[in-house]
């Protein structure tokens, strides 16, 4: 039997291919199930879940930018109970689709409460920890910008979680390396990166920011070079697996993420412009890998990581 060249294995996740719709760009999968069989995907990162329902920020929440978009959705979601009782059971009809649950909160207790429960869902195989949220107990500073706070949060959720934890790193920091190292010391099983870059657009007629929240997260092709740089940086100091994301829209983008040090790839904003983007990437990968002399993604991951170790 021929080995699947697209298969990758990372903590908690045995993936038939590395393509994962990113959290916040795929809802809870229901909308995209009308377009194609979700079982084709490697995994799904579902929308952020908080202990209680959140209604999000006032509108407008989205603004177009050259080669990207700004969003300030505000973690709108139905809350943990609805996700557990309604959203996740609907995805159980896809037996070959491991779910990564994205968890967010306003304080450490929020994260602990959600992580303790959500991993008990039979199809949730890993948790993605969104640490770009403001910490209300510490003046609203994001959890992911302070190594000590990030360490404590990671350690706290690891104590209660029954599935591996992937911490989502923010690019809105001076130096990402000490934060990644603190998270690894806290017991994380891997990283997902990068989250959005903070940005703003101004309406020339009103002379005010377009977004009601004023600032929003920049995503799309514009941020890919930033993602590649930061993935490479983190991969050079840590052996933990990385789910790379940020501006992926082509097969070459996927392979570039792997060559930077990723072990799987998240696809976000591209889902809005082409609902079929994930199946297209999965279909296109084998041919491009053959052209580039890549036997398998597992082999590519091994070669890249060994090269980075030798370069230290």
Curated annotation (Swiss-Prot):
Quote the cofactor binding remark: Binds 1 FMN per subunit.
The pathway to which it is assigned is: Pyrimidine metabolism; UMP biosynthesis via de novo pathway; orotate from (S)-dihydroorotate (NAD(+) route): step 1/1
Summarize where FMN binds, as residue positions: 23, 47-48, 102, 130, 168, 194, 220, 246-247, 268-269
Gene3D superfamilies according to UniProt: Aldolase class I
Q: Which domain of life is it from?
A: Bacteria
GO MF annotations in UniProt: dihydroorotate dehydrogenase (NAD+) activity
Named cofactor requirement(s): FMN
InterPro entries on file: Aldolase_TIM, DHO_dehydrogenase, DHOD_1B, Dihydroorotate_DH_1, Dihydroorotate_DH_1_2, Dihydroorotate_DH_cat, Dihydroorotate_DH_CS, Dihydroorotate_DH_I
Its function, per the record, reads: Catalyzes the conversion of dihydroorotate to orotate with NAD(+) as electron acceptor.
Q: Name it.
A: Dihydroorotate dehydrogenase B (NAD(+)), catalytic subunit
| Species of provenance | Enterococcus faecalis (strain ATCC 47077 / OG1RF)
* Gene of this entry: pyrDB
């Amino acid at each position: 039997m021929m080995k699947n060249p697209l298969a990758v294995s990372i903590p908690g996740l045995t993936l038939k291919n590395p393509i994962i719709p990113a959290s916040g760009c795929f809802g809870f999968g229901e909308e995209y199930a009308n377009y194609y069989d979700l079982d084709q995907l490697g995994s799904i990162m579902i929308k952020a879940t908080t202990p209680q329902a959140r209604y999000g920020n006032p509108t407008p929440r989205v603004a177009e930018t050259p080669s990207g978009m700004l969003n300030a959705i505000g973690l709108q979601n139905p809350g943990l109970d609805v996700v557990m009782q309604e959203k996740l059971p609907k995805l159980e009809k896809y037996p070959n689709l491991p779910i990564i649950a994205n968890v967010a909160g306003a304080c450490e207790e929020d994260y602990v409460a959600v992580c303790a429960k959500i991993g008990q869902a039979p199809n949730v195989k890993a948790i993605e920890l969104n640490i770009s949220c403001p910490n209300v107990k510490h003046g609203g500073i994001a959890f992911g910008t302070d190594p000590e706070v990030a360490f404590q949060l990671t350690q706290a959720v690891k104590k209660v979680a029954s599935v591996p934890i992937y911490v989502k790193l923010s690019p809105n920091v001076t130096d990402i390396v000490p934060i990644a190292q603190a998270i690894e010391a806290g017991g994380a099983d891997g990283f997902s990166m990068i989250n959005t870059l903070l940005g703003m657009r101004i309406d020339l007629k009103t002379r005010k920011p377009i977004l009601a929240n004023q600032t929003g997260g920049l995503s799309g092709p514009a941020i890919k070079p930033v993602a590649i740089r930061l993935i490479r940086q983190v991969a050079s100091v840590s052996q933990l697996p990385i789910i790379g994301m940020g501006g992926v829209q082509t097969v070459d983008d996927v392979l570039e993420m792997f060559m930077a040090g990723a072990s799987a790839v998240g696809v976000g904003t591209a889902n809005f412009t082409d609902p079929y983007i994930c199946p297209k990437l999965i279909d296109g990968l084998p041919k491009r890998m053959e052209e580039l002399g890549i036997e398998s993604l597992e082999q590519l991951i091994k070669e890249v990581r060994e090269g980075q170790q030798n370069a230290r």
